[in-house]
Design a protein with these regions (language model features):
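Conserved active-site-proximal phosphate/metal-binding subdomains
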Residues: 1-110
Length: 110
């Protein structure tokens, strides 16, 4: 639940990419973990040390709800999320919106 709330609270500048120096870039919400990643990467720490920092951090976020030291993987569009809804409801809305757009498209005659 903490992870979901963190995404809902995200703004357009809440994301950062970590792990570039390891060849495994990941976009996450900013927190203490991403700040530490940035410190290690800018100081020239070894790939091994950087990867060690990341071990188990996704589980910490998802399972344990640790939003400070867990890896809160979320893309740039996270700022567009304002509530938690069932996937079925989201898909139904998407299909309804798509159908509406299609009905408003100009008809092309061949």
């Amino acid at each position: 639940q903490n992870y979901k709330q963190a995404i809902i609270n995200a703004r357009d500048r809440s994301n950062v990419v970590t792990g570039r120096s390891t060849g495994h870039p990941v976009r996450c919400l900013r927190n203490k973990l991403t700040a530490r990643f940035e410190e290690l990467e800018t100081s020239g720490a070894s790939v091994e040390d950087i990867e060690k920092l990341g071990t188990g951090r996704l589980r910490a976020a998802v399972v344990d709800g640790d939003i400070e030291w867990g890896s809160l993987m979320a893309g740039q569009s996270s700022a567009l999320i304002h509530d938690v809804r069932p996937a079925a409801e989201i898909l139904q809305n998407m299909f309804a919106e798509a159908a509406d757009v299609i009905t408003r498209l100009p008809r092309f005659e061949s």
